[in-house]
């Protein structure tokens, strides 16, 4: 590995920008929206039974776009019921964006929001110091378990916080996606970091099975348009390269042979499909619903 290569997580602003480019070039949020519309109402059908208020915990809530979709479904299921929505999010920038989104969104009068600038581990430690743990009716962890050091312990802890009829929704890249193939083949040749680990739904279901925790599992197709990655000097492509490889300025710091290998693989059918002149990377998502 060339010494000039460094993890994308060493440059927070570059990471945030590459993540935004990923979202704008992928069907990630559309895929989540489809799940929220078609599956979520059935999943939350009993979480608020005989309750005067519903407590929701968002772990890694980001800028809040998906959180507000979830809240709208809960409101529709339990009209007029008071909702407490607490958000655990380590990025101050994301919390600011979340608050801005709430401020300009209507029909949130029956929801009380609270934000905690901390990681899930910091939240866990803070709660463990308290004598009485808060119980939750719905906990969701959207695309955040990659940033947890001890995933089984995290799953076990948050499962212990579930109230009667409560559920946890976990969204993570599918074991059938191209991310797993990319990580398995090239992970050892890309910069190491302590902040993120390669984990997919395949790993997660094994962990849940080992813990004896019951869950339901759904897979939905999502794609990322990586066509710009094959255009020299394209800024959008450069940022997508960074996101794909979790490497800061991958295009200018990666050894030419490594870049050529990955570029060749990304165009193969096992990684991407070619449609209407676009190269679409398999970004399929898994939705895992954990029961109390």
Swiss-Prot record:
Class of this enzyme: transferase
Gene Ontology biological-process entries: histamine catabolic process; methylation
Matches recorded under PROSITE patterns: SAM_HNMT
Stored Pfam families: Methyltransf_23
Binding site for S-adenosyl-L-methionine: 60, 89, 94, 120, 142
Annotated EC: 2.1.1.8
Keywords, sorted A to Z: Cytoplasm, Methyltransferase, S-adenosyl-L-methionine, Transferase
Positions bound to substrate: 28, 283
Catalysis performed (reactions): histamine + S-adenosyl-L-methionine = N(tau)-methylhistamine + S-adenosyl-L-homocysteine + H(+)
Entry GO CC: centrosome; cytoplasm; cytosol; nucleoplasm
Source domain of life: Eukaryota
Assembly information from the UniProt record: Monomer.
Family of this protein: Belongs to the class I-like SAM-binding methyltransferase superfamily. HNMT family.
Protein name, UniProt field: Histamine N-methyltransferase
Organism: Bos taurus
Lineage: Eukaryota, Metazoa, Chordata, Craniata, Vertebrata
């Amino acid at each position: 590995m060339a010494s000039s290569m460094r993890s994308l997580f060493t440059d927070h602003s570059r990471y945030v920008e590459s993540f935004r480019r990923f979202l704008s070039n992928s069907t990630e949020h559309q895929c989540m929206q489809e799940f929220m519309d078609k599956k979520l109402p059935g999943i939350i059908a009993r979480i608020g039974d005989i309750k005067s208020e519903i407590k929701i915990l968002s772990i890694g809530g980001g800028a809040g776009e998906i959180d507000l979709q979830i809240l709208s479904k809960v409101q529709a299921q339990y009209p007029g019921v008071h909702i407490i929505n607490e958000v655990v999010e380590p990025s101050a920038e994301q919390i600011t964006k979340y608050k801005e989104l709430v401020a300009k969104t209507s029909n949130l009068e029956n929801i009380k929001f609270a934000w905690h600038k901390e990681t899930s581990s910091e939240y866990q430690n803070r709660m463990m110091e308290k004598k009485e743990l808060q119980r939750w009716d719905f906990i969701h962890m959207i695309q955040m378990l990659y940033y947890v050091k001890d995933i089984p312990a995290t799953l076990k802890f948050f499962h212990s916080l579930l109230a009667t009829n409560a559920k946890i929704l976990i969204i993570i890249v599918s074991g059938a996606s191209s991310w797993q193939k990319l990580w398995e083949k090239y992970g050892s040749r890309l910069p190491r970091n302590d902040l993120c680990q390669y984990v997919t739904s395949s790993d997660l279901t094994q962990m849940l099975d080992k813990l004896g925790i019951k869950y339901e599992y759904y897979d939905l197709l999502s794609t990322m348009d990586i066509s710009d990655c094959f255009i020299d000097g394209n800024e959008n492509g450069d940022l997508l390269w960074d996101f794909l490889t979790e490497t800061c300025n991958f295009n200018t710091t990666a050894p030419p042979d490594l870049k050529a290998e990955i570029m060749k693989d990304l165009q193969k059918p096992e990684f991407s499909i070619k449609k209407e002149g676009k190269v679409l990377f398999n970004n399929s998502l898994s939705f895992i619903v954990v029961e109390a």
